């Protein structure tokens, strides 16, 4: 069953999809990002704080947003195997929404830009708000905070490419690929997935009004780096 943001957050605005023609594509310069992470990690931490603030910082450039999100992967684990992240799906599937929200907040305390934790926090609140049989101490405005932050990250990923072979979307984890496809581009059905060179290629069974091509490319340089580091 598709769990779209618009369905679950019936009081919230739908995701802000930026038309490709309206923005410049800015590929991630991994060498530069890693250099900043090693030589000036506080700069990335400051940018992460700005990107994850409750109120959007309209002075941030796209380059700063990119440095914040992708640079964070060098400072903290923000993939789908990090501490506490693995528990989120289990708690959500068991409909333990209060516990899921609490677990998501713990992940976000370490990495405020974890897409998976933001998704679970937002959806947990959405389910609790809609549940008329229980009184939960949460409000739709709290869910909006997580929703807004998630949307900023999606827009940041969207700025790095257009999904083509020439301009793939850059990600730091496989989980981010599926989060981006489902909750930003409304792409749910895939035929197969395979990797070549530095890209994951996903063949789609169906397209959406946000993405009309049958193939979508994700640049996975950082994903491969992290996998290799697990075996070193």
Where do the language-model regions lie?
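Hydrophobic transmembrane signal anchors and adjacent membrane-proximal interface regions, especially
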Residues: 3, 19, 28, 138-140, ...
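Short, flexible active-site-proximal loops enriched in glycine and acidic residues
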Residues: 14, 114-118, 156-160
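N-terminal alpha-helical interaction modules that lie
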Residues: 20-103, 164-232
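Alpha-helical protein-protein interaction scaffolds
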Residues: 64-153
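N-terminal secretory-pathway/extracellular module detecting exported/lumenal segments
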Residues: 108, 159, 182-184
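Long, positively charged binding patches that form subdomain-scale interaction surfaces
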Residues: 141-179
């Amino acid at each position: 069953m598709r769990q779209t943001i618009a369905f679950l957050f019936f009081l919230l605005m739908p995701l802000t999809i930026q038309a490709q023609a309206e923005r410049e594509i800015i590929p991630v310069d991994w060498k530069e990002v890693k250099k900043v992470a090693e030589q000036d990690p506080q700069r990335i931490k400051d940018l992460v704080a700005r990107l994850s603030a409750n109120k959007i910082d309209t002075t941030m450039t796209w380059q700063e947003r990119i440095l914040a999100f992708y640079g964070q992967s060098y400072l903290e684990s923000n993939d789908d195997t990090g501490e506490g992240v693995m528990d989120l799906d289990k708690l959500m599937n068991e409909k333990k929404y209060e516990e899921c929200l609490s677990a998501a907040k713990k992940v976000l305390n370490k990495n405020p830009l974890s897409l998976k934790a933001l998704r679970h926090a937002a959806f947990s609140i959405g389910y609790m708000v809609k549940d008329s049989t229980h009184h939960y101490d949460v409000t739709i405005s709290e869910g909006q905070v997580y929703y807004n932050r998630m949307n900023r990250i999606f827009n940041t990923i969207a700025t790095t490419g257009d999904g083509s072979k020439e301009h793939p979307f850059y990600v730091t984890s496989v989980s981010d690929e599926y989060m981006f496809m489902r909750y930003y581009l409304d792409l749910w059905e895939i035929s197969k997935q395979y990797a070549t060179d530095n890209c994951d290629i996903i063949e789609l069974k169906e397209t959406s009004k946000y993405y009309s091509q049958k193939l979508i490319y994700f640049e996975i340089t950082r994903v491969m780096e992290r996998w290799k580091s697990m075996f070193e």
